């Protein structure tokens, strides 16, 4: 969500220039990826780029203001209030040494746009927000619906961002297993190490699944199978020639 908020505040091209949109082919928490990308975070959908995106969020220099903007934006995407799981936040804060290294390495390369410790703390807090599968599906549906939440009717972000978001999900969403996923399903999707996965078909629907057991890349094993089945059953391959939507039906469902 922070990547979408950053693009909504600055525009897609500025975020592309400051962070990037290229897949790394490496684990989501890789430090080596920064070095191999010529000091560039590469994409806001892995840890380095997400920390960089947190540093960009306005108001710059105001931790409380940034956090309020992020929480409000996520709640608008989800269609209902969200909250941090305090136990998870405390645990992550006590052990996030790798991410701290990433934040300061990015600072060294001028790819952090605010205080690095502030950016890291905000990133850690946002990663500790708990959502339901329904909220995750509503977020996906909002992305699919050109930024308009289909449950609340609220315009959450600029409609021209949906293709950019979907393209990043398609190329980076499953970390180093993205190619296999896209080849198999043709569904732009974003996974998280909490066990949730959201899929987006622009103009059609958003879908989500949740199950904690993860594979080696940090992707939910069961949620992958569920979404792959749904994508095949409903013909959701965005590279295919058919669509599940019929005339007269609602275009976006959560």
Where are the predicted features?
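Short secondary-structure junctions and interdomain/linker hinges
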Residues: 60, 77-85, 109, 113, ...
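Aromatic- and histidine-enriched alpha-helix N-cap/loop-to-helix transition segments
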Residues: 1, 44-48, 131-134, 202
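Residue-level preference for non-acidic, small/hydrophobic
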Residues: 1-4, 139, 207
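Structured C-terminal helix/loop/strand segments within mature extracytoplasmic catalytic/sensor domains
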Residues: 144-254
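Penicillin-binding protein/beta-lactamase superfamily catalytic region
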Residues: 104-164, 217-220
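Alpha-helix initiation and N-capping motif
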Residues: 50, 67, 71, 99, ...
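Active-site-adjacent helix/loop patches that line small-molecule binding or acyl-intermediate pockets
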Residues: 5-126, 142
